[in-house]
Amino acid sequence: MTGAAPDPAEQFREACRAWLSKSPSRDTRVNYAHDLNEFLAFMGLDGDHPERLVAVRPHHVAAWRDRLREGGLTSSSIRRKMTVLRSLFSYLQTYGYMGVNPAHSDFVAAPAVPRDGKTVGLSPEDCRRLLDAPPSDPTGIRDRALLAVLAYTGCRVGELTRLTVGGYKQTGTHRVLEVFGKGGKERQVPLHPEAVERVEEWIDAAHIRGELRGPLFRPSRSARGGGRDGFAPRPMTRRAVQRLTEGYVRRLNLDPNVTVHSLRVTALTTARERGSDIIDLQEFAGHADPRTTLTYIRSRDRLSKSPAYVLRY
C-alpha cells in the first residue's frame, strides 16, 4: 500500500517557509514576511495560499513598485522590498516552481537611489543638543544613556534593543558593548567615555548591575509589565526607541525628518570627517561591504570641499 501523493500546494508553502527560515535573524524574518504578505495583498491573494504566486508576471511586480511609489515610500524602501521579492522567486526557481523570476532586474527596474542616502543626518551641534535634552529623572537617565549609545556607536535600533547588561564589559583598557547585528553577527564596539559615564549612571539608577542576561535598555513601569524598580525586565521595542527619539527631536524643533536612524548616519559621517578610515568604519558599522558604509556618509558643505579649490597651475 502506498501513501497519499504529496500535496503540491503544501510543498510550495513549505518551499516558502524554507526561504523565510534561511535568515538567522528574527527581525529579518519578520520584515521579509511582512513584505511578502504586502505583495500578496496587493495581488489579491490569500496569505495562506502563496502557491498562487506562480501566476505572478513582471507587469504585476512593476505595478506593485509603482503603487508603492505613489504611496510615498522612499526609493530605498521600494528597492529593499523588491529585493525581498526577487530573493523569494529565485529560491522558488531552485525548487522548480518558477520558469523565470518575474522580479528580476532584467524585467523590472527598481527605482534609483542617490549615493548620498535619504536619511537626514545631524550636525555635531544639533547632536549635542539631542544628547543633552533628556531630564535627570530615572527615565531621563535611561534616555541619556540610550541616545549616547546610538550616537557614539552608530548601532542600528534593532541592535540597541538586543543589548544586554552582560554585553557591557571591560576588554583590556576599553569599555565595550557586544553588539549582535544582521544575520546574528557579533562585534565588539568600544564606548566613548561620555557614553560609559551615562551607561554606568543608568545601570545604577535601574538597579540592574549584575543581571548578565537581562536587557540593557528597558521600558518604564508605566508601560505594560513594569518591574519593581520602575522598569520592566524586558527589552524596549524598536518602535518605543523610535518614538522616544522623535519626541526629543520635536521638543528641540530639529528637522522633522530626523529619525533614530539619523544617529547612525551622524556617527559614521562625523567619524569619517574626523579622519576615520573607511575600512575601520565598515567594521564599526557592521557592514559586509564598504560600499554600503559609503552610502551612510553625508557630504557636509560639499562645494567648499571641492577639489576645484586645490588646483594650482
Residues of each region from the PLM?
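Conserved catalytic core of the tyrosine transesterase superfamily
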Residues: 1-313
